[in-house]
Swiss-Prot record:
Sequence ranges of Polar residues compositional bias: 1-10, 48-60, 127-152, 1005-1015, 1054-1082, 1101-1111
Residue ranges of the region described as RNA-binding: 299-401
RNase H Ty1/copia-type domain boundaries: 1610-1752
Protein's name in the database: Transposon Ty1-LR4 Gag-Pol polyprotein
Biased composition (Basic and acidic residues): 1038-1053
PTM per Swiss-Prot/TrEMBL: Initially, virus-like particles (VLPs) are composed of the structural unprocessed proteins Gag and Gag-Pol, and also contain the host initiator methionine tRNA (tRNA(i)-Met) which serves as a primer for minus-strand DNA synthesis, and a dimer of genomic Ty RNA. Processing of the polyproteins occurs within the particle and proceeds by an ordered pathway, called maturation. First, the protease (PR) is released by autocatalytic cleavage of the Gag-Pol polyprotein yielding capsid protein p45 and a Pol-p154 precursor protein.
Binding positions for Mg(2+) 3 per the UniProt entry: 1610, 1652, 1685
Gene source species: Saccharomyces cerevisiae (strain ATCC 204508 / S288c) (Baker's yeast)
Description of its domains: The C-terminal RNA-binding region of CA is sufficient for all its nucleocapsid-like chaperone activities.
Keywords: Aspartyl protease, ATP-binding, Cytoplasm, DNA integration, DNA recombination, DNA-binding, DNA-directed DNA polymerase, Endonuclease, Hydrolase, Magnesium, Metal-binding, Multifunctional enzyme, Nuclease, Nucleotide-binding, Nucleotidyltransferase, Nucleus, Phosphoprotein, Protease, RNA-binding, RNA-directed DNA polymerase, Transferase, Transposable element, Transposition, Viral release from host cell, Virion maturation, Zinc, Zinc-finger
Length: 1755
């Protein structure tokens, strides 16, 4: 390819400014990927070899014969010497000419690449005749140059370089960052000097020594372009080039000027680093000198922090000032000003008395609180004061020196230890000092002896873990450079020179030795009491002696000052000389790691974090001083700019201009909060808030939904309010970009009223801070108020309203006024305010009886908007009323006592506070107030209607069964009511809502859900009122709902034999919610029953039998009875609690029905299948009932409930009809292309792994002879339809391996190139589950295999061609395929036929009829899934024999042989299986879900409350038309595809309990409304919360040697849109769930019986097929059973009368069902609905029911 490239540029000379020294010829078809680690290694070896040679060779000897290839150098010519740099490109010096120029001297050839020919490296106009430098030449800028000398020289030095001797010239490094340009220019100037171009370099006056020629200018331009890419140039350089792209001389001139300007900075740094002060000059002059230097450096951008400045100053102090050197050990945060205070104090004492020793102290408190310092010892400190704690208490000395040591820590660089510590640091320029980093301990000048040291003694240290001494004369058996790290109290390293033994010879002539470390960098010789204790020596500070544990005195302890010392006379001297120990390497490398390198090495952390980590030794191996921090401040990492992109920062106080530009109420902020779930429908789910920018006045309005008309009503209201009340006109309203604000309706309204909408920018919620903060504040207040008062959650908006009133009246700390005052309103009269939730007694002006009490307990909420009254909540009436007729309830029974607030709130104070308000009402009260109205006009919170599914416990302890008191009155006197029944009036059940309709007891952090069935976001509640509902044609109405009536005691069921009530399920028509209908008279009911259609006579009464299981036939033999019991015995059916009779008191009958529309559901198209009503007469037929919507509206009109909104008619539309302008949805791509994985992959490690996988795949393709390598075809000669595009795809597997696959583009394959009749088969999941189940029951061994590159073993019949892989470099050629390449349409079928033939002919297997990819013989069963095989056998040797045969033909890998008797873990087709033979098998996907779900970008809540069920029952999905643009629609559909795709994969693998929810949501993939997405998120959240759940199987222990195959069936009638029914089936083998199915019925059923028949008919075919599979795999007899909870279906199957079906449209299906049951020897039995586990397949269930039906088989 190189030759082709060069031939296209004949005008380019083959000479080059770079000479190649590689010794291998570059071939045109070489794989570019091979230029990797191995090639670099060869170059480095060549470079190393070059460095060892000392001779050079003329350039002419390197000229190759072939101008297109780099020839190897002659063996006699040694490669050039040029230091440690790679030798890919060198430059030679040929007298006075630039090296490598073809017409100046001999050219030096280099291999060319297309990158060199890029036009970007040539100036416009005529092309330069000089060759360009390749991008790979040069060395990284971070590589230190070995050349010494000045960065630039004058002409004389340049001329001196012009010698006749040729030498090789190293090119400059590549510029990699704009911050590195100053350093790069120096190396570039050096390069020009070495290239005999020193005369053209501008001097200090800006002019060159000689005039530059055109050829030299071209050379200058080309080399500058090569080694200084435009993207890395500083801005000022780009500005020069933008004017004249060839003006390199101006760039060099300005660079030299900048170097000169840095001289003053360098001088200041050198001066600061070499300060000396001993008091000979005034302290003021010294301070002025230092501060001036620091100020100049700071002004020039070189920041000198206090810590560095203090260290530099203290290092130069001497004489009486030297003790201040160690002040930094006491004061870590000392400033320069504080240090000079100490210097001034000593200087003044010096001047006052020259002969007195200074005893200056900064502060006495410092002496008490800080570690021991190195000051003089006027008042020395005590090291160990407590004799009892000498061994474990850390002394101050320890904190000042060595807090901890570690033998595993990397040793510090000891090169600097042997240097003189008193020698000042000499700096040549400012780059020698890296400012901002802390000086290490080794650079601090330590004196040999401190002033407070006792000479000839060792200081006893109770806190030091090691003994340290400064002299080496007492160290025995010393070894240099120990791998020990010792740090002082400030976590600084103390360099250690050697380690050895310290030997003692005590008074009792005993000798003892301990380990000792040698370092000259400490102030005292420290003797560790911890190490002495290790050799049985302790210090007794009461006797002042060292002694053994037996009391033997070894040596005296001397107290000098506050320290304790031991004489060195007890130490034995050694024969080791000091130079031996101190012989440490002194050649410290000056190379520093560049900050960009460290930045990338440490995961792109910021400089401050990296420096802090190095300073605190959290990162080891190198220190802070080893890094070049000069570019850290200005360095911009492009990866960080992209990966860490953030929103713009909002300027504090930026809204002041709005406050100055607008008058009050002209600029509003608004936002919507919601929805709040699990509330009654009368309670608002949202609220919208408004805030005035100038006055900060707030308004809040409740919302039940976010429809356009609802929002528009609120905007109309507030604009009229502001206009009329404040005589102002709103000019601007700021809001976010929610659809409720951006719709056309509101936009036209604002435009009509002349209001400017101000929207926030995309994803910039902070710009909407005013409204967002208000909502957050109000919600905080709401939660607090509800928690304090104990009121139920459905009163949440009342708490918001109360908070808004109060906060409008509170003064702002900033403006000193309240919002009401800014608005010109009077302050809030607190006497009119009651605490939120204050218990009160409200007068009932219209009781049901004159003898009933007139007082009703209630709870004060907030002042009324519409009157002078107060909004009060009456739990007994489930109302809020607006009234002034109330009395504050006094006594200890107030709701505050449950929070122990009695000490904070007092009734006396409350009465005194509200006295004036109540006296005003009393004095102006003329007649009894009649404002207590049950149908209150309060527009937002009256008639608190409970959720229709909420449970009602009318038999609470407060109500007796015989109590007939109406619900609105009380039977006890007011005193008892106020004292005992304030929280729970007898007529109301305290458990009536999720959070309790009355104030609860003190709420715990974990919500109690013992009697409340709800999901994490709500759940399903039971009915609280008697309801009527239409029924089906069948008088028996056998459905999946039939036995699921709920006891009002929260029992699962009740017996109808003990009551006069009949259970009637509320059907869900057309997918709408369940509408209740009013009670009707018995007479009317009987009238409607007369016109009822006749039912099937064969249907027996459903509730006459008390048996749970009813067979299709009456057992006539013991065998049949045993069969029934055997089928039921092993099934994982729930254990039900014992039933109890339920009685219904009279008050329950008198409660009126309440109807309202439903809120959004968690799963759509679902009616309340678990809600039941009671009537006193017979059932009614479905045909005679009006539609639910009509009845509900009539009920609403009849009851005249003005405060309730009637149910809205939902417009049902077809899902596809709602999709507008949908073209195609792109499939989800999880793989990477070649350019993503390799070419542009910035992750080097991952790139290398993909490259390795690439070569592995290519080698495998060649090994398998995938294509014909003997002949290449021209593309023009081949029919285009036979040419298949190919590509490499890359992906990372679950086990962490990186995979590359060369595939064909089968998606665009022409139909003529394959046989469409061929099929690619894989094992059915039911077959795999059946095989696994049989393996568990029969103690089989399970072996898992994998066949590498399986498709490539199959030959291809068709004539097909593909393009060669990229590494061959033949884009215009084609190769003919010989094997079935992955991706071809026919590859799967070809492989299936190949492996099938081999297994049958060579392995003696046969394929099970009807179950593809399941093979068996007498000993082994094989399940095949493409290239994965699972073998089952009783004898492991049988599996091994099959494996040996497979290995003879295929590359077979054993993934898991399965020979262990312990638990074995498999990963089979995505299932994570734990199997212990003969005991159990667990199937799950925890690891897979843990990895995949977080990648879906679903807002998970890992720390919050876990969901207990995947959805809520009883609600529906709104089907209003979507108003959404096409791009957003496609994005949401794509998101739904990902979420539902993963959920389906998991559900059909083993989470059969989720199939209903998955199937329902899958029907709405093309209808991605906000509600549907929320439901999907809820499902994914439940999967995340239960990702550890497993399908549990236990080995079957049968009573008979039979296999039992059972299908459990269920159906939900008409609960899907368009009256479609949901059907579900679960299949079990020997009591183990092996599969499940949930789907919407294809036909519209007209009754529950027909729906059940449809479900059973769907189950029987698969049941028969599974029966055949089980019999083929295991020769035992098989019993087939089918269970259903529909007695009507069983009766139809049982009946032999055909006449009754002739006029039935489901008669044909029923007759066929009879034939299938009788012809397949199928047993059909009745199962009670409460035990029907298939119920989870047809409808959403309450938590309790859901858990009850699933916890036996999945947990």
């Amino acid at each position: 390819m190189e030759s082709q490239q060069l031939s296209q540029h004949p005008h380019i000379s083959h000479g080059s400014a770079c000479a190649s020294v590689t010794s291998k010829e570059v071939h045109t078809n070489q794989d570019p990927l091979d230029v990797s680690a191995s090639k670099t290694e060869e170059c480095e070896k060549a470079s190393t070899k070059a460095n060892s040679q000392q001779t050079t060779t003329p350039a002419s000897s390197a000229v190759p014969e072939n101008p297109h290839h780099a020839s190897p150098q002659p063996a006699s010519v040694p490669p050039p010497q040029n230091g440690p740099y790679p030798q890919q490109c060198m430059m030679t010096q040929n007298q006075a000419n630039p090296s490598g120029w073809s017409f100046y001297g001999h050219p030096s050839m280099i291999p060319y690449t297309p990158y060199q020919m890029s036009p970007m490296y040539f100036p416009p106009g005529p092309q330069s005749q000089f060759p360009q430098y390749p991008s790979s030449v040069g060395t990284p800028l971070s590589t230190p140059s070995p050349e010494s000398g000045n960065t630039f020289t004058d002409s004389s030095s340049a001329d001196s370089d012009m010698t006749s001797t040729k030498k090789y010239v190293r090119p400059p490094p590549m510029l990699t960052s704009p911050n590195d340009f100053p350093n790069w220019v120096k190396t570039y100037i050096k390069f020009l000097q070495n290239s005999n171009l020193g005369g053209i370099i501008p001097t200090v006056n800006g002019k060159p020594v000689r005039q530059i020629t055109d050829d030299e200018l071209t050379f200058l331009y080309n080399t500058f372009q090569i080694f200084a890419p435009s993207q890395f140039l500083p801005t000022w350089v780009k500005d020069i080039l933008s004017v004249d792209y060839t003006d390199i001389m101006k760039i060099l001139s300005k660079s030299i000027e900048k170097m000169q300007s840095d001289t003053q900075e360098a001088n200041d740094i050198v001066t600061l680093a070499n300060l000396q002060y001993n008091g000979s000059t005034p302290a003021d002059a010294f301070e002025t000198k230092v501060t001036n230097i620091i100020d100049r450096l700071n002004n020039n951008g070189i920041h000198i922090n206090n810590k560095v400045a203090c260290q530099l100053i203290m290092r130069g102090l001497s004489g009486e000032y030297k003790f201040l050197r160690y002040t930094r050990h006491r004061h870590l945060n000392m400033t320069v000003a504080e240090l000079f205070l100490d210097i001034h104090a000593i200087y003044e004492e010096q001047q006052g008395s020259r002969n007195s020793k200074p005893n200056y102290r900064r502060n006495l408190s410092d002496e008490k609180n800080d570690s021991r310092s190195y000051t003089n010892t006027t008042k020395p400190k005590v090291i160990a004061r407590n004799p009892q704690k000498t061994n474990n208490s850390k002394s101050k000395t320890a904190r000042a020196h060595n807090v901890s040591t570690s033998n595993n820590s990397p040793s510090t660089d000891n090169d600097s230890i042997s240097k003189s510590t008193t020698e000042p640091i000499q700096l040549n320029n400012k780059h020698d000092l890296h400012l901002g980093q802390e000086l290490t301990e080794s650079t601090v000048n330590h004196t040999n002896h401190s002033d407070d040291e006792l000479p000839g003694h060792l200081l006893l240290d109770s806190g030091a873990s090691r003994t340290l001494i400064r002299s080496a004369h007492h160290i025995h058996s010393a070894s240099s450079n120990p791998d020990i790290n010792v740090v002082d109290a400030q976590k600084r390293n103390i360099p250690i020179n050697a380690i050895g033994d310290l030997q003692f010879h005590f008074q009792d002539n005993t000798k003892t030795s301990i380990k000792v470390l040698h370092t000259p960098n400490i102030a005292y010789d420290l003797l560790s009491l911890n190490e002495l204790a290790a050799v049985d020596i302790t210090a007794c500070f009461t006797k002042n002696v060292l002694e053994r544990s037996d009391g033997t005195v070894l040596a005296p302890i001397v107290k000098y000052g506050d320290f304790y010392w031991v004489s060195k006379k007890y130490l034995l001297p050694s024969n080791i000389s000091v130079p031996t120990i101190n012989n440490v390497h002194t050649s410290e490398s000056t190379r520093k790691y560049p900050y960009p390198f460290i930045h990338r090495m440490l995961a792109h952390a910021n400089a401050q974090t990296i420096r802090y980590s190095l300073k605190n030794n959290t990162i080891t191996y190198f220190n802070e001083s080893d890094v070049d921090w000069s570019s850290a401040i200005d360095y911009q990492c492009p990866d960080c700019l992209i990966g860490k992109s953030t929103k713009h920062r909002h300027i504090k106080g930026s809204r002041l201009k709005y406050q100055n530009s607008y008058e009050p109420f002209q600029y509003l902020h608004t936002d919507i909060f919601g929805p709040v779930h699990n509330l009654p429908n009368s309670a608002p789910s949202y609220f919208i808030s408004f805030t005035d920018e100038t006055t900060k006045f707030r308004w809040v309005y409740p919302l039940h939904d976010r429809r356009e008309d609802s929002i528009l009503d609120v905007f109309t209201t507030i604009l009229a309010f502001i206009k009329n009340q404040f005589q102002a006109s709103v000019l601007v309203i700021q809001m976010d970009r929610g659809s409720e604000y951006t719709n056309r309706t509101l936009h036209k309204f604002l435009e009509k009223n002349g209001i400017t909408p101000c929207y926030t920018t995309t994803a910039d919620s902070r710009a909407h801070g005013v409204a967002e903060r208000l909502n957050r504040t109000l919600l905080d207040d709401c939660r607090t108020q509800l928690q304090c008062s104990g009121l139920p959650n459905h009163l949440w908006f009342s708490a918001i309203e109360f908070s808004t009133i109060v906060r409008n009246s509170l003064a702002s700390p900033k403006s000193k006024k309240s919002a009401r005052q800014h608005a010109g309103l009077a302050g809030l009269d607190i006497s009119t305010l009651l605490p939120f939730g204050q218990p009160v007694i409200v007068n009932d002006h219209n009781p049901n009886s004159k003898i009933h009490p007139r007082g009703i307990p209630g709870y004060a909420l907030h002042p009324s908007r519409n009157s002078y009254g107060y909004i009060i909540y009456l739990p007994s009436l489930k109302k809020t009323v607006d009234t002034t007729n109330y009395v504050i309830l006094q006594g200890k029974e107030s709701r505050l006592d449950q929070f122990n607030y009695d000490a904070l709130t007092f009734d006396e104070d409350l009465n005194r506070l509200t006295a004036s308000y109540h006296s005003f009402i009393a004095s102006n009260e003329i007649q009894e107030s009649n404002d207590l109205n049950i149908e209150s006009d309060h527009d937002f919170q009256s008639d608190i209607e409970l959720h229709p599914e909420q449970p009602r416990n009318v038999l609470s302890k407060a109500v007796s069964p015989t109590d007939s008191t109406p619900p609105s009155t009380h039977t006890e006197d007011s005193k008892r009511v106020s004292k005992t029944n304030i929280r729970a009036p007898r007529e109301v059940d305290p458990n009536i809502s999720e959070s309790n309709i009355l104030p609860s007891k003190k709420r715990s952090s974990t919500p109690q859900i013992s009697n409340i069935e709800s999901t994490g976001s709500g759940g399903m509640h039971k009915l609280n009122v008697p309801l009527l509902a239409p029924m089906s044609q069948s008088n028996t109405h056998e459905s999946s709902h039939a036995s699921k009536s709920k006891d009002f005691r929260h029992s699962d069921s009740y017996s109808e034999n003990e009551t006069n009530h009949t259970n009637v399920p509320i059907s869900s028509t057309g997918g709408t919610n369940n509408k209740t209908v009013p009670q009707i008279s018995d007479q009317e009911t009987e009238k409607r029953i007369i016109h009822r259609s006749p039912s099937i006579d064969a249907s027996p009464p459903e509730n006459n039998s008390s048996h749970n299981i009813v067979p299709i036939k009456t057992p006539t033999t013991v065998s049949e009875q045993n069969t029934e019991e055997s089928i039921i015995a092993d099934l994982p059916l729930p254990d039900l609690p014992p039933e109890s009779p339920t009685e219904f008191p009279d008050p329950f009958k008198e409660l009126p029905p309440i109807n309202s529309r439903q809120t959004n559901s968690s799963l759509g198209g679902i009616g309340d299948s678990n809600a039941y009503t009671t009537i006193n007469s017979k059932k009614r037929s479905l045909e005679d009932n009006e539609t639910e919507i009509k009845v509900s509206r009539d009920t609403w009109n009849t009851k005249n409930m003005r405060s309730l909104e009637p149910p809205r008619s939902k417009k049902r539309i077809h899902l596809i009809a709602a999709v507008k302008a949908v073209k195609s949805i792109k499939p989800i791509r999880t793989t990477l292309r070649y350019d993503e994985a390799i070419t542009y992959n910035k992750d080097i490690k991952e790139k290398e792994k993909y490259i390795e996988a690439y070569h592995k795949e290519v080698n495998q393709l060649l090994k398998m002879k995938t294509w014909d390598t003997d002949e290449y075809y021209d593309r023009k000669e081949i029919d285009p339809k036979r040419v298949i595009n190919s590509m490499f795809i890359f992906n990372k597997k679950r086990d962490g391996t990186h995979k590359a696959r060369f595939v064909a583009r089968g998606d665009i394959q022409h139909p003529d190139t394959y046989d469409s009749g061929m099929q690619s088969n894989t094992v059915h999941h039911y077959a795999l589950m059946t095989s696994l189940s049989l393996a568990l029951d029969n103690n089989y061994y399970i072996t898992q295999l994998d066949i590498s590159s399986a498709y490539l073993y199959a030959d291809i019949k068709e004539e097909l061609y593909i393009r060669p892989p990229p590494h061959l470099g033949m884009n215009d050629k084609l190769i003919r395929l010989k094997k079935s390449l992955y991706g071809l349409k026919q590859s799967g079928a070809n492989w299936y036929e190949t492996i099938k033939s081999y297994l049958i002919q060579q392995c003696g297997m046969e394929e099970v009829r009807g179950w593809s990819c399941v093979f068996k013989n007498s000993q082994v069963t094989i399940c095949l899934f493409v290239d994965d095989m699972v073998l089952f056998s009783k004898n492991l040797n049988s599996n091994k024999r099959i494996i040996e045969k497979l290995k003879m033909q295929y590359d077979t890998k054993i993934i898991n042989l399965g020979e262990s008797d312990e638990e074995i873990q498999y990963d089979i087709l995505g299932l994570e299986i734990k199997y212990q033979r003969g005991k159990y098998m667990k199937l799950g996907m925890e690891n897979s879900l843990t990895e995949k779900i977080p990648k879906l970008n679903v807002p998970l809540n890992p720390k919050g409350r876990k969901l207990s069920a995947p959805g809520q029952p009883g609600l529906y999905i709104d089907q209003d038309e979507l108003e959404i643009d096409e791009d957003e629609y496609k994005e949401k559909v794509h998101e739904m595809q990902k979420l539902i795709g993963l959920a389906s994969y998991v559900g059909y693998k083993f989470r059969f309990d989720l199939l209903y929810y998955i199937n329902t949501l899958a029907q709405h993939i093309l209808f991605p409304s906000r509600q549907v997405l929320d439901m999907t998120y809820e499902l994914i959240q439940f999967m995340w919360d239960t990702r550890d759940k497993q399908l549990i199987w236990h080995k079957n222990k049968p009573t008979k040697p039979d296999n039992k195959l059972v299908a459990i069936s269920d159906a939900s009638y008409g609960n899907q849109p368009y009256y479609k029914s949901q059907i579900g089936n679960i299949f079990l083998l020997n009591g183990k769930v092996i599969g499940g199915k949930s789907t919407k019925a294809s036909l519209t059923c007209t009754s529950t019986t027909e729906a059940e028949i449809h479900a059973v008919s769907e189950a029987i075919p698969l049941l028969n097929n599974l029966s055949h599979l089980v019999q083929e795999l295991n020769k035992k007899p098989i019993i087939k059973g089918l269970l259903t909870d529909s007695r009507s279906t069983i009766s139809i199957i049982k009946s032999t009368n055909e006449e009754k079906f002739r006029n039935r449209f489901f008669g044909t299906k029923a007759m066929r069902l009879r034939d299938e049951v009788s012809g397949n020897n199928l047993y059909v039995y009745y199962i009670e609905t409460k035990k029907n586990i298939a119920d989870v397949m047809t409808k959403p269930l309450p938590i309790k029911t859901f858990k009850l039906l699933t916890n036996k088989w999945i947990h």
